[in-house]
């Protein structure tokens, strides 16, 4: 499943996305937890989630259940 998250300059939503990924146990494959421009991979017990950020937007892709959990956490603040 793929989902658009926010505009690239929506830093509040980007922060909520990173918090949700951490809360769900995601391990970032990169050297930095920041979401700079590019493709970022996060590993979870239930699979891998990718986050793509460019100059215009941020989106995620991964297993349906995992993407749904992330969307729930960033949209209304519901915690696991």
What are these regions (language model features)?
Residues 45-78:
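Short, compact, well-ordered microdomains
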Residues 1-33:
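Negatively charged, low-complexity tracts enriched in Asp/Glu with abundant Ser/Thr
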Residues 2, 37-39, 55-59:
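A generic structural signal for beta-strand entry/edge sites
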Residues 20-24, 73, 77-80:
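Conserved short hydrophobic interaction patches
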Residues 29-49:
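Amphipathic, interaction-prone secondary-structure segments
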């Amino acid at each position: 499943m793929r989902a658009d998250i926010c505009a690239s300059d929506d830093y509040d939503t980007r922060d909520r996305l990173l918090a949700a990924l951490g809360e769900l146990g995601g391990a970032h494959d990169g050297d930095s937890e920041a979401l700079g421009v590019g493709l970022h991979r996060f590993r979870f017990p239930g699979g891998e989630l990718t986050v793509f950020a460019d100059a215009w937007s941020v989106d995620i892709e991964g297993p349906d259940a995992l993407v749904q959990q992330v969307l729930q956490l960033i949209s209304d603040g519901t915690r696991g």
